[in-house]
Design a protein with these regions (language model features):
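Buried, small/hydrophobic-residue-enriched core segments of structured protein domains
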Residues: 1-183
């Protein structure tokens, strides 16, 4: 995004419908204050609305975020795709700009304003049929794939993907986790 541009709105999709995608709800556990502070900061960057799409899980802190237009999304993929949400909620016309922010980046922005420090950590899901025990890990952005998978994969020829199987990128063991990826 060009910082000189003012977006007509900002979208955050906390809905993961892609296969083998990480749960945003799980990834944000313990970062509720940072997430709200990030929303507060983002709301100052647009005269329009900050849109937050959620799955509407009962008891989720995401249902109670202040300063957003809350959208409860359900259904199969691509329902969680932020582009689908924009097209249905606030379509972009010629010359207009809409910004999209990953939920964990909202928390990182909030952390910067609350603590004065950038937090490069990200919660990721190591998943797939060739993973011995699929689980979540807290890593630093750009973590080396080899460090993430050593001793965690089944024997044989394994295809490694940074991101989900539909939109991710094939990576080598010596490669790195994509900047925006959480699986």
């Amino acid at each position: 995004a060009n910082p000189a541009d003012e977006p007509k709105s900002i979208f955050i999709s906390a809905v993961s419908t892609a296969p083998l995608g990480a749960s945003h709800e799980f990834a944000l556990q313990g970062r509720e204050k940072e997430f709200q502070a990030g929303i507060d900061a983002l709301s100052k960057l647009t005269k329009g609305q900050v849109h937050l799409s959620v799955q509407g899980i009962a008891g989720s802190f995401l249902n109670d975020i202040n300063g957003v237009a809350l959208h409860k999304v359900s259904g199969k993929h691509p329902a969680g795709n932020v582009g689908v949400q924009i097209a249905n909620v606030d379509p972009v016309n010629a010359g207009e700009k809409v910004w999209c922010v990953h939920p964990q980046d909202v928390a990182a922005i909030g952390s910067l304003f609350l603590n004065g420090k950038y937090d490069p950590s990200r919660v990721i899901a190591l998943t797939g049929s060739e993973v011995e025990n699929p689980e979540y890990y807290s890593v630093i952005r750009g973590a080396m794939i080899e460090d993430l998978v050593v001793g965690k994969l089944k024997e044989g020829n394994v295809r490694l993907i940074s991101g989900d199987p539909l939109t991710g990128s094939s990576v080598k063991r010596k490669g790195a986790l994509g900047f925006y990826h959480d699986s």
